[in-house]
Amino acid sequence: MSKAQRAEVDVMLRQPQPEGPRSVEEIRAGFRALMARMTVPDTIRTTRTTLGNRPALRVEPHDGPGAGTILYFHGGGFVFGSPETALSLTGHLVARTGFGAHSPDYRLAPEHPFPAAIDDTLSAYRALLDSGEAPSSIAFAGDSAGGGLSITTCLAARDAGLPLPAAIVAFSPSLDATRTGRSMDTKEAVDPVFTRKAVEHTGAMYLAGADPHQPLLSPAVLADLTGFPPLLIQVGTNEILLDDSTRLAERARSVGVDVILDVTADVPHVFQAFAGVLDEADEALDRAALFLSQRIRAAGTPHTSTK
């Protein structure tokens, strides 16, 4: 693990931003430009498709997928991002597990506020089940807002009476729209990505006046996680959303959920996106791939060994 690598990533993320609030279009363009700098494996192929009446990206190994499916939810504060901006993450999970992935292009705020994103991700999961895929062969995964969706989509599926997936992997998930975690303030000085003001700005677009005190918006403090599948949460210490992860893990443990809280020191929000640049990113993705391969195998489905 290299302090020099961590410093390089920190400098990249702290590039000066324009003064004053940015428009939604400027925020989206800036995020696309940042994520275009991330490394995508050359051992995958992508295909545009539809899933649950929404556009989606199908990601597969070049030599074809094994018997397992990752339903991947991209990050972006529910306001920006796309399956393409998350391809460094989806692609590395696919390359490491041999599974195929679907990444739905769920609707974004402010044009489509809560609960549009959850409606779309739940619809994507229904579509996989309706196509004949066994829930034991499906895992949810996501980063940031998409990490939050991996939890809230599972809540919505359980409440709808659907069978739950085999496992969940959440990278730096956003899990508390009430913004009550202590790390929102104690970590602001070391977080190179977010400030409280920034997440409250985009969060307000997603809420559109909705009360944040409800499980589908703040699962870290309000959700009953009873019956959830095994859960892996990966988070860095240099992020204001750290307590979203620690509190959700505590809630999961309290109701008997098999949960791994995987905290990496001195790395930023969704540090896994820096695979190939940051040793900790590659190591975390290796752990996530092993977790997925083991859990889908434990559910009784054939699988491809972790590569």
Task: Describe every region a protein language model picked out.
Residues 84-103:
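Short amphipathic alpha-helix adjacent to the substrate-entry channel of hydrolases
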Residues 67-76:
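Short beta-strand element of the alpha/beta-hydrolase
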Residues 82-83, 102-137, 275-281:
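Catalytic nucleophile-loop/oxyanion-hole region of alpha/beta-hydrolase
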Residues 1-64, 293, 297-307:
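A glycine/proline-hinged amphipathic helix-loop "lid/cap" segment
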Residues 247, 253-307:
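C-terminal catalytic histidine-bearing segment of alpha/beta-hydrolase fold enzymes
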Residues 233-235:
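Short beta-strand/loop motif that positions the catalytic acidic residue
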Residues 155-213:
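Hydrolase active-site cap/lid region
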Residues 142-154:
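Glycine-rich nucleophile elbow surrounding the catalytic serine of serine-hydrolase chemistry
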